[in-house]
Amino acid sequence: MADKKAMNHNNKSVMKNKSVMKNKSEAKNKSEVKNKSEVKNKSEVKNKSEVKNKSAVKNKGEVKNKGEVKNKGVVKNKITGKKKDRETVKPMGEKITASKERQKKYAIEKTVKLATEKRTAPKTEKKKQNDMCQYAKKCGGCDYQGLSYEKQLREKQEYVRKNVGGFCRVLPIIGMENPYHYRNKVHAVFDIAKGGTVISGVYKAGTHDVVNIDSCRIEDETADAIIRDIRGLLRSFKIKTYDEDTGYGLLRHVLVRRGFHSGEVMVVLVLGSPILPSKNNFVKALRKLHPEITTVVLNVNDKKTSMVLGEKEAVIYGKGYIEDTLCGCTFRISPKSFYQVNPVQTEILYTKAIEYAGLTGKERIVDAYCGIGTIGLIAASKAKEVISVELNRDAVKDAVTNAKRNDIKNAQFYNADAGQFMVEMAEYRDDQKKNPTPASGKSGKRATPDGNVDVVFMDPPRAGSDEAFLSSVVRLAPKRVVYISCNPETLARDLKYLTKHGYEARECQPVDLFPWTKHVESVVLMQYCGK
């Protein structure tokens, strides 16, 4: 910024072909020194400026000389003492080289050459976009608006290093080649603005005021277009938006999910009541605008709550879910299913996690907080047995379906709290027979009768894991624990517990799943070293 201000100030200066600057100074010992400097700037000025300075010299060789060249850049040299080179100011886009100074007893001759050279940024560093998102100050969703992507990665790298670096080596963060429109899940809240205009977008940070958004740089473009057209259809079909204050109205939210590889699109209409007038005609009109839509689901949320989705659902078009592929497996994604929003970076993250597990085909693994079974099913072909546990019943049903869809027969799924499940496994190994309920809802034979586990994958929510889970991991003592985290702070807290109880953190790999936000994913390998 200092360079820019100097450049702006100097551009306002009047420069003639030959400019003479005369400075008078008082000299002791009646010594006068005349110093002439020629400056050539190839980018702006091809003239020679003569600078005559009369400097005061005290005693032997102490010279104070201030020379100022007014050009596109500003160079100030302060020299004190003998044969001492000083660094010069380096404007953006210019490279400055200075010849060696020759100092005589009462005179200094210095030649400074300004050579304009375009400073080329490395291929890995792209220039920051000049235009910020038009919703940046209202939406609040993207924490890093105004920062170049390279700067964002450096910030996240430091964030992970600060929290995890004390436990193990932190590898350089893996960023995206194209950090735009990566979100395969888009949610919009609907409202009426002053004047009766239908708007949709997100809540303004800290409020329930809706910020109207037509398009978002991190959201799937197809999803944004569908949401915009739904706004228009509401007017045509005279469907009112839901009013949170009064409880009147129908449409509350719209959720759009799109398969990155499959291209399948699911639209979820969240209503305040179970009846959508002219629903068939509405779907027909919507699909006429967007034939890529493969399914439409009505979700009923008739409670005054901040939750987006309600309990009841009805499929009004298509199969009620979409499918997509990840790391070679096909996954079923329902309206409520947890599925990472950035499939490109998720493949990188999960591939690294399975690499850390060091599977040989003989291991019994636990996939805790499994969601729809992604990590465990991807790892199944490299393991002897997979035991997956998830609290969300709908997600577990999808996981069971996904195992069948991929013809995976060595995986079993349990609908249970991960912490309690691990406690029971540890107790069972200690000959206390407490069996969890399988996902089918029927009591069945224990998946691990001896309670032995070789590898644990854990991917908890932002709050991290809990002591019940972690203490059970310590009791079961698997050889390796692969911890996937979306919060470096809670990750550090849990690593502290595990490292105090026989585990050593070996390596951490940060992966940027959420460009333009402060959030970052990390995967850590932990090895059991004994108590």
What are these regions, as identified by a protein language model?
Residues 2-124:
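Intrinsically disordered, Lys/Arg-rich low-complexity segments
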Residues 3-8, 278-280, 284-288, 292-531:
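Rossmann-like S-adenosyl-L-methionine
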Residues 127-133, 209, 529-531:
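Flexible, glycine-/basic-rich loop-and-beta segments that form/coincide
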Residues 140-241, 261, 276:
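Extended interfacial segments that mediate partner engagement and assembly in macromolecular machines
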Residues 172-179, 244-245, 253, 257, ...:
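Short, solvent-exposed loop/turn elements at beta->coil junctions and helix N-caps
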Residues 201-204, 268-270, 399:
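Short, acidic/hydrophobic/Gly-rich beta-strand patch recurrent on exposed beta strands
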Residues 256, 263-272, 330-334, 455:
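Short, aliphatic-rich beta-strand segments
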